[in-house]
């Protein structure tokens, strides 16, 4: 900073020079002292220079409205919104989110460093600050078949990027606590760069948790009960309280929303569908929900602002105080957390739920050919769905409402007219398949899914964490083939087939994960699909696509299905579907 600039800032803060912008007569949410101050907020050149009594070149009388720091999502996968950067910004910035920390491991699993470069390129000029954690597990484990493999040497150069804050969720906790050499190399590089390492270790406890933290893992977003969260807090980790589309853990973790725990806890969404962002909100939604549950509003705000900024080392961000970046939101109502205005670097960027100057997606498709042409598989045939009956019992992967966890259920092998062998609609058991789509290997994993609720037809999705192969669930093979081939034809997306007809589809041509359309356009097609599926039995407490997308992730207990077959996550072994 030039000496003259600093001098002007000091004189403005002192009140000797008029500020560029003053938000007058505000109620300022102070996240340092947990109080609300009656004051003006003085802003110059994107920086807050004072909280007190000020005059400005431009003055805005807030008439007692609240001024709050801009909200920060400490852990999200933008790709899970199905939106590219500009459309994602339009969905979250009007809700008061001024910064996100994203882990682009979805697109990196499909397209490797080309996917990472795509995300960096398409978010660099947004008003929304988009920071990155480098994908640590591409693929998630050795028992997965991704489109790319990212080792330490591929990640190392990215630590020089100013928007890269560290190494993203170490999902392979099994390998981490056993000092796997490749994981150790990634940890070493991140530590040498002075950056953060995020965790992902559901139910890790005792000595293994000690080993995980010793490795340098400083946070966790997978806690689903208070006892797990407390143990991790005691071992020095920060807790990311997750409230997303599929995984909703806030209610179980409400005891953390008070001292002394709240200073080590932050709010995150992890994965959010576009409709939830547009209608319910983003971090503002979690704060509203917490306040409704009896949480002190200022504590909830602190967990969505200052705490993530302190954790990630985002200096001079996350508070309304002198010297802090003027990323601010104006609230008309604190209890309802109603966002009226959003300021980014002191400039008004959103008002009454709309961005003032939305950005458009501008990208060289030729440069990112691997991103826009990500399907490398042959047409699906009925023969690929043939499951050999090698026994009298079948293993069912059972979904858990409002959770990513699954359970195991063993039932007698069944055959009913009009459905594929093993399908029992009355018992909510459907057939499940995962087709490899990156290397034309022809690998197919087959199994059974419980509690999904589908009564007829088939659902297909190229969003299938984390390797994002093609996952299909259905009651009969013919519709499964049709739904899967529809997604293949569209180079990615979602589809629902019924009685030999495609009832609905949502193309996602960007790595098979994202659309180039607006959030509203994507949501309209998504809701039409969800409505059709709901009419055909999908369980009320299951998100038809978000929940299905996690069924193939072999790092969350208990059972998963990928291109190799059914994975016992705890044992990290393939187990038979029929035995």
PLM features: residue spans?
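Active-site mouth loops of central-metabolism enzymes
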Residues: 73-84, 139-150, 218
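Divalent-metal coordination cores built from histidine and acidic residues
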Residues: 2-12, 89-194, 260, 503-507
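Active-site microenvironment of metallo-dependent hydrolases
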Residues: 1-39, 43-44, 52, 93-95, ...
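Active-site beta-loop-alpha junctions enriched in small/polar residues
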Residues: 77-79, 105-107, 135-140, 170-173, ...
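Divalent metal-coordination and catalytic microenvironments
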Residues: 26, 46, 64, 75, ...
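Short acidic, glycine/serine/threonine-rich loops at helix termini
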Residues: 111-115, 141-147, 178-182, 208-212, ...
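Histidine/acidic residue-rich metal-binding segments in metalloenzymes
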Residues: 149-169, 175-240, 247-268, 278-292, ...
